[in-house]
Structure formats: structure tokens, C-alpha cells
């Protein structure tokens, strides 16, 4: 087993971070080495053999962790590399995985994640696992976020780009599902080919069939010429099927056939056309429930959900809101020629709002604020819906009973448990009977006298 004789090199320009990682991954049979520069790590990789390299991406000096990865994979293709970064973004996650990294971990560390990742990397090294081929860096797509939920999304995108399998993106309206679909396309081998979008819930069944599969001249009224469907248009590219959960049942059958056979038949046509388009679908509905309710085909669901990416709602990643605000203000300011800032109080209120429309609603709100701003957006400038929302602190205690209500419930519970015996109740509560009477009167509780209890 590799774990019995594993040599691990830890690379970080911070000595304390190196020591911390070493403590986390130390185990019997593991030989740990540390260095603080990419140059030293590359030198060691060329002179010695390691089963695993754990390196920060951002290192002091001209070379980065990606350079360490490249040198190590050239010197020892059978080894594994885990990259670490304190500035988790989609670009770094994709570059790391596609450059051949086994995995990508963000700071601050999750102890269990670090240990599990190292264990899996050593296990795969012992089996001679393969890695992704090296490619160049990639441009940003406008996906913003550093919370754990978004870092998980970045990892899923990074794994999806090198696969030709269908992808299902789940998330509420406005969470950025099309952005994720485009990111998968532009990072993959099909980036130079078409990316075609179809909203399955926005057009009728007849038009949807023609949109997807095309039609021949005379197939229906108004079909005055042959027309290619999106699967033919996107040959060797990507078809993005938005709102797939709203697709009519009859169309689900035909889509399933395309996924199974790689062929489409235009409406009114008598021949099939081969298509090599990759399918990325998105939905804001619970497809598991739709399958259970027989509104969505189970076999199609299985075909589409080979890779599943779940986008968190904005309310579940509030820490990303300031980053989003900053980007949206920058974009809107560039379009309008205005220099606008958002006050801390306004930012806090924007973070407190639940954003039912998610990122799209936030972006539209910021756009309006910039357009009508006189230079600085204050709390009073925010929409009434945002101002009316409870603060984070208020929402934390929302729905909790008042102290009087808790006191009342407790007194009723004690009295019922003791059969209404006032003396025993006072004793249990640690008060005298007079205080018990005053408490009951204040809380609106009628105390039965001994005669009433006897009956």
C-alpha cells in the first residue's frame, strides 16, 4: 500500500502553514518534507521522487504552485499534486484541475477535507490513476463568490469541463445557471464550437420540437424552407436546455432518443441526422419530485444527471453579497459613466434582504441605484422592500416566543404535572405562594382552589 511508504512534499511560503499542513497529514509510514519557494520545490522534484506534492498556488517569487505542478508532473507523471489557495475562484480551480492537479483545497482549511483529500490522492497514486491533460489558463466568466458553497461549484465545473457527459444544473431562478453552463463550455474542448441556448418553458410544444430538431420545408404552415435545429447547429458544441423541468412529456421522449442514439429527425423529415452536441440542462424545479409525480421521465432524468451541479441561493451565501455589489457597481458605473459608492449601512441592509430573485435581482437593484444615485448610495436610497426586511439579528430571533410566553408555558406545565397543587407548584418553582398568585395573575392563568381540585 502507498500509505506505508509515502513521501510527501509540502510547499508554502509561510513556515507556520507548512507546519500546520504537516501536522494534519502526518501518519505512520508518511515521510514529510517542506520548502517555502517554488524554485526549491522544482529543484527537489527534479532530484528526488515524491508520491504527493501539496502546494500553495500563490507563492512568493516569479513562479507559482502551477509551475511546481508542471515540473512535478514532468519529473514524475505517476505522482499526485494537491493545490491550495486562499483566494478561491473558478479560474484557479479550473486551472488546477485541468493542469493535472488531483484536487484543489481552499483556505481556511477544513481538517477533515485536507486529510480525506490526501488519503484519496495517495490511494490513486498507488493505483496509477490518470490525470487531466495540461492546457492554458482560461478567462473569467463573471461567476463571483468565495463561500464554501461556491467553491464547491467551482470544483464541480472543473471536473465537468473535461467530460463529455450530460450536466444538470439545479438552482432557483436568478442563481446564475446559464453562467455556469457557459463556463463549462468555454473551459472545455468544445469552446471554439457553438453554444446554443433553448428555453424549454418559453415556447409551445410544436415550436420547441422545430427549435430542437429543425424542420423540412412544408412540414407545417409557415415552414417555407428547411431549417436546422439547435442540435444540428451545435454539432460538436454545446446545447443548453434551460427550464428542462417544463419540457412537455412528448418532447421528453424525443430528447431521450437524442441522448441515447446521437441522432435527430427534423419535423416532417424522413431521415435522421447525426449530432455530437453535448447537453447541459438546467432547472429551478425539484426534478426528483417531478419524477415521483410522473411529470418528468425517470429515464431522461438519469440520462441528464450524470453530473449534477447545485447552485446555492443568494440568501445561503450572504458573505458573497459585498463582492457581488462591488462588481455590479463597477459594471453599472462603466456603462453609465458615473462613479458611485455604496455606504456601509446600505451594504448591511442589502446583506439582510432575502433576495427571492437571487443574483439577478441584486444586479438589477444595483443597476437602478447607480442610475439614480448622486454619487453615494445611502440607506434611505434603497428600495422599500429592502428597507422593510428584518435585519440579520432580528431574523435570528424571529418566531421565538417572548419571555412572558415561555414563563406562562412553564407555569402551566408545572401546574398540570402537579394536578394544580399550588403549594407543591410554588415549592418546585422555588417561590412562595403569594409570588405564585401574582405570577399567575400577570400571565392570565386561573388557579384552582383546593375545593375545585377535589371535584
Question: Can you describe what each PLM-predicted range is?
Answer:
Residues 112-120, 188-193, 268-278, 285-388, ...:
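Nucleotide-binding/hydrolysis machinery
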Residues 3, 15-33:
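Two-component/phosphorelay signaling modules centered on CheY-like receiver
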Residues 109, 156-221, 232-248, 313-318:
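Conserved post-Walker A coupling segment in P-loop NTPases
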Amino acid at each position: 500500500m502507498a500509505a506505508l511508504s509515502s513521501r510527501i512534499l509540502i510547499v508554502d511560503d509561510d513556515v507556520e502553514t507548512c507546519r500546520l499542513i504537516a501536522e494534519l497529514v502526518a501518519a505512520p509510514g508518511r515521510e514529510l518534507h517542506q520548502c517555502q519557494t517554488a524554485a526549491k520545490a522544482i529543484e527537489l522534484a527534479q532530484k528526488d521522487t515524491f508520491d504527493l506534492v501539496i502546494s500553495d498556488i500563490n507563492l512568493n517569487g516569479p513562479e507559482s504552485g502551477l509551475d511546481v505542478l508542471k515540473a512535478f508532473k514532468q519529473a514524475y507523471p505517476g505522482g499526485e499534486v494537491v493545490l491550495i489557495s486562499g483566494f478561491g475562484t473558478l479560474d484557479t480551480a479550473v486551472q488546477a484541475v485541468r493542469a493535472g492537479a488531483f484536487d484543489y483545497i481552499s483556505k481556511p482549511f477544513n481538517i477533515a477535507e485536507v486529510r480525506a483529500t490526501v488519503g484519496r490522492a495517495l490511494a490513486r497514486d498507488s493505483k496509477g490513476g490518470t490525470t487531466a491533460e495540461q492546457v492554458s489558463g482560461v478567462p473569467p466568466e463573471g461567476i463571483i463568490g468565495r463561500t464554501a458553497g461556491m467553491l464547491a461549484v467551482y470544483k464541480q465545473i472543473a471536473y465537468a469541463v473535461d467530460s463529455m457527459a450530460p450536466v444538470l444544473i439545479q438552482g432557483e431562478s436568478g442563481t446564475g445557471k446559464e453562467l455556469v453552463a457557459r463556463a463549462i463550455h468555454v473551459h472545455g474542448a468544445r469552446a471554439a464550437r457553438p453554444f446554443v441556448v433553448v428555453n424549454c418553458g418559453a415556447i409551445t410544444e410544436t415550436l420547441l420540437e422545430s427549435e430542437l430538431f429543425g424542420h423540412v420545408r412544408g412540414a407545417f404552415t409557415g415552414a417555407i424552407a428547411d431549417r436546422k435545429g439547435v442540435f444540428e447547429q451545435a454539432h460538436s458544441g454545446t446545447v443548453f436546455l434551460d427550464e428542462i423541468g417544463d419540457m412537455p412529456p412528448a418532447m421528453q421522449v424525443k430528447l431521450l432518443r437524442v441522448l441515447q442514439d446521437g441522432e435527430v429527425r427534423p419535423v416532417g423529415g424522413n431521415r435522421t441526422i447525426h449530432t455530437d452536441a453535448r447537453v447541459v440542462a438546467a432547472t429551478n424545479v425539484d426534478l426528483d419530485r417531478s419524477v415521483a409525480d410522473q411529470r418528468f421521465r425517470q429515464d431522461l432524468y438519469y440520462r441528464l444527471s450524470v453530473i449534477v451541479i447545485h447552485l446555492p441561493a443568494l440568501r445561503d451565501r450572504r458573505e458573497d453579497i459585498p463582492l457581488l455589489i462591488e462588481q455590479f457597481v463597477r459594471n453599472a458605473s462603466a456603462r453609465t459613466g458615473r462613479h458611485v459608492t455604496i455606504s456601509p449601512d446600505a451594504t448591511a441592509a442589502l446583506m439582510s434582504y432575502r433576495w427571492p430573485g437571487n443574483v439577478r435581482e441584486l444586479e438589477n437593484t444595483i443597476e437602478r441605484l447607480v442610475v439614480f444615485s448622486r454619487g453615494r448610495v445611502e440607506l434611505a436610497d434603497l428600495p422599500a422592500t429592502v428597507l422593510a426586511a428584518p435585519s440579520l439579528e432580528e431574523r435570528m430571533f424571529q418566531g421565538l416566543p417572548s419571555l412572558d410566553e415561555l414563563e406562562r408555558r412553564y407555569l402551566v406545565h408545572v401546574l398540570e404535572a402537579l394536578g394544580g397543587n399550588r403549594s407543591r407548584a410554588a415549592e418546585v418553582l422555588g417561590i412562595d405562594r403569594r409570588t405564585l398568585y401574582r405570577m399567575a395573575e400577570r400571565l392570565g392563568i386561573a388557579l384552582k382552589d383546593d375545593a375545585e381540585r377535589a371535584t
